[in-house]
Curated annotation (Swiss-Prot):
Entry EC number(s): 7.5.2.7
This protein's UniProt keywords: ATP-binding, Cell inner membrane, Cell membrane, Membrane, Nucleotide-binding, Repeat, Sugar transport, Translocase, Transport
Quaternary structure, from the entry: The complex is composed of an ATP-binding protein (RbsA), two transmembrane proteins (RbsC) and a solute-binding protein (RbsB).
Organism: Chromobacterium violaceum (strain ATCC 12472 / DSM 30191 / JCM 1249 / CCUG 213 / NBRC 12614 / NCIMB 9131 / NCTC 9757 / MK)
Gene Ontology MF: a single term: ATP hydrolysis activity
Name recorded for this polypeptide: Ribose import ATP-binding protein RbsA
Domain of life: Bacteria
Recorded family membership: Belongs to the ABC transporter superfamily. Ribose importer (TC 3.A.1.2.1) family.
Length: 502
């Protein structure tokens, strides 16, 4: 199927999101759609998939004008979307989510046995056969939920498949399997739109690329005839300097010391030190316990063994409030459910952790809050009209900056980062890297989990690798490679010269 979108414009109230955008998609190709957060990528794809209606413009499918007034109309036309934000019903089983609204039946009664068989087949085709079709969707990890979302879209046998950040929560193996499936779909004539901030993936799997900036179409390129620098210039309209800015200051004294850390069900025997001004990266496959270390240190999971010291004194944390009071901060993996209160304003979210700083006689001063938050908005380049804007209306990258803003108002001694750049565009990533370096230069000890190995290697001084909840080693980032980290993460042998003990 060939898709042509002409003159597409869309506004939400007074805010213009898209203006006269052009986009074409051919059958048998994987077409990347890129742009900074807030550029309009997701809105354009929601128009194509029937979630939103354009204010102006037209959509042609194989040369014929199409009226895609709903997701049902889009699906009937052969268009399916995998949303950036997970869209499963937590209380339903995996198989019920996969076949919601189109359940197989016999004699008017849902055929659960057939549904289970088909669900298992769809998951196995994705290399996700370990997911139980009867499990509640809400009980799955974020990565597993993402695989279910992908299986749900593939089950529709769509001729046009829109993938909005599909790999954000996947392991390297799952990503490889997804790319194999995408190649098969392309060979079968499917048209795929691939929305991602991961430049390496774009150049690995896509044929063409279109770029949006500030709601406008900037241009289109053949992947084979462009490069990273040109795409970045098209996206941001400027040079962003070094992709991974360097940090010059040497680490100071030991700030955080962890010995024999264990939680209730995932990690055991974890030990490391982090110095003031140092970034300790944590790498490993999904489900290896990376996030569990951070949650246990922050009091979001119960510690069952081990000792933790902060500045040489034992740290006892029973709940997140204890961790915050001691000087720990946490940027969680899932910003929407764990890092932000979506019904509150940018100002209220940014000051939530340290409200006492803005209170007089027990009453919070909104004016004091606003003065502080206006400074943070400028410092972090948060794209928002003002501090009173609902945080739920911001793009993903700007929401992530608000999560950082909570801790920048009163920088912690130790900052725990769980996938800090997930769903953030290349310009936003550079800004977050700068924030991390600023905090480290000011003496904050940083522990960072990331699934992007180039990011871990570039930002970290040392890297702790996990394998199935156990420590596989600690490596000097300067003398390490992605292959070494993956070998350790999968339980393989590694060269001893890059390995260090905690």
């Amino acid at each position: 199927m060939q898709v042509t979108m002409r003159g597409i414009s869309k506004a939400f109230g007074p805010v213009k999101v898209l203006e006269n955008v052009e986009f074409t998609l051919r059958g048998g190709e994987i077409h990347a759609l890129m742009g900074e957060n807030g550029a309009g990528k997701s809105t354009l794809m929601k128009i194509l998939s029937g979630v939103h209606r354009a204010d102006a413009g037209e959509i042609l499918l194989d040369g014929r004008k199409a009226e895609l007034r709903s997701t049902e109309a889009a699906e009937a036309a052969g268009i399916a979307i995998i949303h950036q934000e997970l869209n499963l019903i937590p209380q339903l089983s995996v198989m019920e989510n996969l076949f919601l609204g189109r359940e197989p039946s016999r004699f008017g009664i849902i055929d659960y046995a057939a549904m289970r068989r088909e669900a298992r087949a769809q998951l196995e085709a994705l290399g996700a056969g370990g997911i139980d079709p009867d499990a509640e969707a809400g009980s799955l990890s974020i990565g597993q939920q993402q695989m279910v979302e992908i299986a749900k879209a593939l089950a529709l046998n769509a001729r046009v498949l829109i993938m909005d950040e599909p790999t954000a929560a996947l392991t390297e193996r799952e990503i490889d399997r997804l790319f194999e499936l995408m190649a098969q779909l392309r060979e079968n004539g499917a048209a795929i739109v691939y929305v991602s901030h991961r430049m390496e993936e774009i150049f690995r799997v896509c044929d063409r690329i279109s770029v949006l900036r500030d709601g406008c179409f900037v241009g289109e390129r053949e992947i084979a005839r462009t490069d990273f620098d040109e795409v970045v210039r098209m996206m941001v309209g400027r040079e962003i300097g070094d992709r991974y800015p360097k940090r010059e200051a040497a680490p100071g004294e030991v700030r955080l010391k962890v010995e024999n850390l264990a939680d209730e069900n995932m990690i055991a025997g974890i030990g490391f030190e982090v110095r003031a001004g140092e970034v300790l990266g944590i790498a490993g496959l999904m489900g290896s316990g990376r996030s569990d270390i951070l949650k246990t240190l922050f009091g979001a999971k119960r510690r069952t063994a081990g000792r933790v010291e902060l500045d040489g004194k034992e740290l006892k944390v029973a709940a997140p409030g204890d961790a915050i009071a001691a000087g720990l901060g946490f940027v969680p993996e899932d910003r929407k459910s764990k890092g932000l209160v979506l019904g509150m304003s940018l100002r209220e979210n940014a000051t939530l952790v340290h409200l006492d700083q803005y209170a007089r006689l027990g009453v919070v001063s909104a004016a004091e809050e606003k003065r502080a938050v206006d400074g943070l908005i400028a410092q972090l380049r948060i794209r928002a009209r003002d501090a009173e804007l609902d945080v739920k209306s911001l793009s993903g990258g700007n929401q992530q900056k608000v999560v950082f803003a909570k801790w920048l108002a009163n920088p912690p001694k130790v900052l725990l980062l769980d996938e800090p750049t997930r769903g953030v565009d290349v310009g936003g990533k550079a800004e977050i890297y700068h924030i991390v370096n600023q905090l480290a230069a000011a003496g904050t000890a940083i522990v960072m989990v990331s699934s992007e190995l180039p990011e871990v290697l570039a930002l970290s001084n040392r890297i702790l690798v996990l394998h199935e909840g156990r420590q596989a080693g600690i490596f000097d980032a300067a003398g390490c490679s992605q292959e070494t980290l993956m070998a350790a993460a999968t339980g393989g042998a590694v060269h001893s010269e890059t390995r260090k003990q905690a």
